[in-house]
């Protein structure tokens, strides 16, 4: 093999000429062990808690959660099959963040903010950290504007205000998601207008659900024209636990963008029980000490720091709001389990859905006796307060009397009247799915129920009475509905008009 000196010197000269003094320094570690979505890493001495790390060989990212003396425990945001012992791990020097802004509306994304709907890349210029501190006391204002769910039983008895956290709790298959989806659909009219203060942008976070279920929900939103003002964040049942844990925080960061820009957001977490289970799995695999029901000690903090980010801000901070509707699934109506009691104590009220009511055909299956809204009544519009004040007491009396009436003893006339009224009001509060009602329609219908217009018609005809009354109002008395909507109160003139409409209608109803 002949060695040409000229060639060698030319190569050396070019290498010397191209030699740069700058050197890239990166903090690198090695994988000690990996499995179940958790990696133990040696090295990375300067990594921060909650910092993103990268596994370049496998092309996935993770987050450092446990900083121990001799190793770092990291959760992996993706499949861990491609990661092997001894693989290189790099610090990214950043905390988990996601894209935010209007560009996400109408899109379906994963918890890292990457699109999964096949509609191309997300158009967004701004990114936000997923886990930030909730607003303090000074920037906040008390809840005073309503969130209209479009469901009579909720808007009349358990009203929700903008900036509130209202828990939806019940067993599986009791219609929890249906209540949340109807609330999104009911915002269509407000979001179609030009008044930004009336609009409510929605974020739906699906945690640990079947992909087919999520696809059906997205299809429903699309068919009803509601997807255009909604962001859907999905961590399905087949995703690793760290992504199911991250999804609510990602959705919240997207919703907070609306709140902090003087707009109004609504976020639905469906459901937080599955996030708690995912967090329990991660914590146990990271060898953190278990507590009650094997959940880690900070599972309360997990939910409180998430739900405290829903707030109504004052004028100095843009008057924006973020309303949260967390969903919790119970086992056999047991609301005294660990996670349900935690979330009940964090939220500003709860809507209880019961299996028994659901199978009796009372849908939405809201138990109005034990459901409460701690701050929503101050957000209710005056017209609704005027007509719904009586219904609460009457339904409470009806439930008490109905329990005694089971014994079959002879009932006096006043008790029979009370039972008859209660039956009709219960029937009146029933509502089919995907058929939310505008607040002015609800006011007219509830007025008819509480003022005795239904007392003389059979219970089976209540639904027909309602639909025909609304048809009459829309065809002949549109101005009455418009006035209730704009004035938000029933003054003497409006009440007299409504009375005469109802008198004429009930005289002809048969």
From Swiss-Prot:
Write the record's keywords in alphabetical order, separated by commas. Answer: ATP synthesis, ATP-binding, Cell inner membrane, Cell membrane, CF(1), Hydrogen ion transport, Ion transport, Membrane, Nucleotide-binding, Translocase, Transport
Q: Which NCBIfam families match?
A: atpA, PRK13343.1
Superkingdom in the source lineage = Bacteria
Keyword flag Lipoprotein: no
One Gene Ontology MF term:
ATP binding
Q: Which InterPro entries match?
A: ATP_synth_asu-like_sf (IPR023366), ATP_synth_asu_C (IPR000793), ATP_synth_asu_C_sf (IPR038376), ATP_synth_F1_a_nt-bd_dom (IPR033732), ATP_synth_F1_asu (IPR005294), ATPase_a/bsu_AS (IPR020003), ATPase_F1/V1/A1_a/bsu_N (IPR004100), ATPase_F1/V1/A1_a/bsu_N_sf (IPR036121)
Subunit organization: F-type ATPases have 2 components, CF(1) - the catalytic core - and CF(0) - the membrane proton channel. CF(1) has five subunits: alpha(3), beta(3), gamma(1), delta(1), epsilon(1). CF(0) has three main subunits: a(1), b(2) and c(9-12). The alpha and beta chains form an alternating ring which encloses part of the gamma chain. CF(1) is attached to CF(0) by a central stalk formed by the gamma and epsilon chains, while a peripheral stalk is formed by the delta and b chains.
Q: What is this protein called?
A: ATP synthase subunit alpha
Q: Give the similarity note.
A: Belongs to the ATPase alpha/beta chains family.
Catalysis: reaction(s): ATP + H2O + 4 H(+)(in) = ADP + phosphate + 5 H(+)(out)
Main localisation? membrane
> Its topology with respect to the membrane?
Peripheral membrane protein
User: Where is ATP annotated to bind?
Assistant: 170-177
One GO CC term, this protein: plasma membrane
